[in-house]
Amino acid sequence: MSNIWHDINPRRISPEKFMAVIEIPKGVKNKYEMDKETGLLRLDRVLYTSTHYPANYGFIPRTYAADNDPLDVLVLCQESIVPMTLVECYPIGVMKMIDDDQVDEKIIAIPFNDPSYAEFKDINQLPQHTFSEISHFFRVYKSLEGKKLL
């Protein structure tokens, strides 16, 4: 059984263009994570708050962040993307936050094949409300779990 975590060709991952693996579609409260051993999705939890994911959320294979997990990525798209879908993206920026006293960076990316977002090349070009929704989500989504994010 192939495992996208480590079996994807490294030439498909570069700073300018990469394949993102979607774990969580936008608009849901279920938090899925890929099981590193099996390569399958597992339900981590249902969010405790009434908030839902404001964008498709996943990771960039063959990368590592400070938390020893792959780099997190939010893929802005007009549609929800089915979990475990590979999406060819380009980065437009990064959101930095602190989660459990650790730096937690989220790459903000655009799929090459969504005409609604094709004009955005930099995070500063996003509508302020889009940025505010994403920021708000990450400030509050763990609040009822007793965890603090900055």
Predicted regions and their residues:
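Hydrophobic N-terminal alpha-helices or hydrophobic patches in metabolic proteins across all domains
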Residues: M1-L150
